Swiss-Prot record:
The encoding gene: trmD
Residues spanning the signal sequence: none
Keyword Transferase: yes
Native source organism of the sequence: Sulfurihydrogenibium sp. (strain YO3AOP1)
Top-level taxonomy: Bacteria, Pseudomonadati, Aquificota, Aquificia, Aquificales
Top-level enzyme category: transferase
GO terms (BP aspect): tRNA N1-guanine methylation
UniProt similarity note: Belongs to the RNA methyltransferase TrmD family.
One example GO MF annotation: tRNA (guanine(37)-N1)-methyltransferase activity
InterPro entries linked to this entry: Alpha/beta_knot_MTases, tRNA_m1G_MeTrfase_C_sf, tRNA_m1G_MeTrfase_TrmD, tRNA_m1G_MTases_N, tRNA_MeTrfase_TRMD/TRM10
EC number, as in UniProt: 2.1.1.228
Assembly with partners or alone: Homodimer.
Role this protein plays: Specifically methylates guanosine-37 in various tRNAs.
Name this protein carries in UniProt: tRNA (guanine-N(1)-)-methyltransferase
Keyword match tRNA processing: yes
C-alpha cells in the first residue's frame, strides 16, 4: 500500500514511521508512507497556505490552490488513490472502516488545519473521517490513528494473524482481560480458569469477559454484534450480575 499525506507539518510523521509495527511494515515493503508538504505547492514567497473566511468568522482556512496542486502532483505519480480528509464532522472511524481502507492500494489523506479547508477541496475527496467527538488542533493526530489502524490490517504486517483477529472490535465486541506472570501480585490473583489448562473452559471465560466488558463500557456495540444463542444466554447472566465462577459452581458452564 502507498499512503500520501498532504500536510503543513511533514516532520510530524517521522517518529511514527520509525518505530513498531509501522516501521517493520515499511522495511518489509508492505507500506510506503509519503508526506507531501503543502507549502511546497504555494505560489508566493511567504508560502501562504491559509486565508480569511469569506463572510466573516473566526480563524483561517486552508486555501484550495495548494491542496489542488499537491493532489495533482500525487495523481501524476500514482494510479487511482482513494482520498480521505480528516474532519470533525466526518463519519466516525471504526474497525470496519479500517478494514475497507486496508483493501485500497493507494490512499491520500488530507490533514485539515485551523478552521478547516475551503469547501471546494471536498470535490477531491471520497470520504470525510472523524476519529471522535472532540476538537484537535489539526488533522495530523487523526491521520496517525487512521494509518496505525489500517497498516496493521495489511496482509503480512502482523507476524501472528490470530493476534489481529482476537483484538478488540474484530468481532464487534471489546477484548477480554489478559494476564501474565506472576500468578499473584500484591494480593491480586490471575483467575484460576486461566491456570487450569482447560482450553475449552478458557475460551468460554474469554467470551464471557468480552461480553461483560462490552456490556459495561460500550453497550451500543451489542446492538450490532452478531451474537450466538450461547452469547445471548451469557449476556443474560451478566445483566443479572453473575460472575463466570458463579456459573461454574451452579453447573451452568462446564
Amino acid at each position: 500500500m502507498k499512503i500520501y499525506i498532504i500536510t503543513i507539518f511533514p516532520d510530524y510523521f517521522e517518529c511514527f514511521k520509525n518505530y513498531g509495527v509501522v516501521n517493520k511494515a515499511i522495511k518489509s515493503g508492505l507500506v510506503e508512507i509519503n508526506t507531501i508538504n503543502l507549502r511546497d505547492f504555494t505560489s508566493d514567497k511567504h508560502k501562504t497556505v491559509d486565508d480569511v473566511v469569506y463572510g466573516g468568522g473566526p480563524g483561517m482556512l486552508l486555501k484550495p490552490e495548494p491542496i489542488f496542486k499537491a493532489f495533482d502532483y500525487i495523481k501524476n505519480i500514482s494510479k487511482n488513490p482513494y482520498t480521505i480528509i480528516t474532519e470533525p464532522w466526518g463519519k466516525t472511524f471504526n474497525q470496519e472502516m479500517a478494514r475497507k481502507l486496508a483493501e485500497k492500494e493507494e490512499l491520500v489523506i488530507i490533514c485539515g488545519r485551523y478552521e478547516g479547508v475551503d469547501e471546494r477541496v471536498k470535490t477531491l475527496v471520497d470520504e470525510e473521517i472523524s476519529i471522535g467527538d472532540y476538537i484537535l488542533s489539526g488533522g495530523e493526530p487523526a491521520t496517525l490513528v487512521i494509518m496505525d489502524s489500517v497498516i496493521r490490517l495489511l496482509p503480512g504486517v502482523l507476524s501472528d494473524d490470530e493476534s489481529k483477529e482476537v483484538d478488540s472490535f474484530s468481532d464487534g465486541l471489546l477484548g477480554y482481560p489478559n494476564y501474565t506472570r506472576p500468578a499473584e501480585f500484591r494480593g491480586m490473583k490471575v483467575p484460576e480458569v486461566l491456570l487450569s489448562g482447560n482450553h475449552k473452559l478458557i475460551e468460554k471465560w474469554r467470551r464471557f469477559q468480552k461480553l461483560k466488558r462490552t456490556y459495561k463500557n460500550r453497550p451500543d456495540l451489542l446492538e450490532k454484534a452478531k451474537l450466538s444463542v450461547e452469547d445471548k444466554q451469557l449476556l443474560k447472566y451478566i445483566i443479572e450480575g453473575k460472575e463466570f465462577e458463579d456459573l461454574i459452581k451452579e453447573g451452568k458452564i462446564a
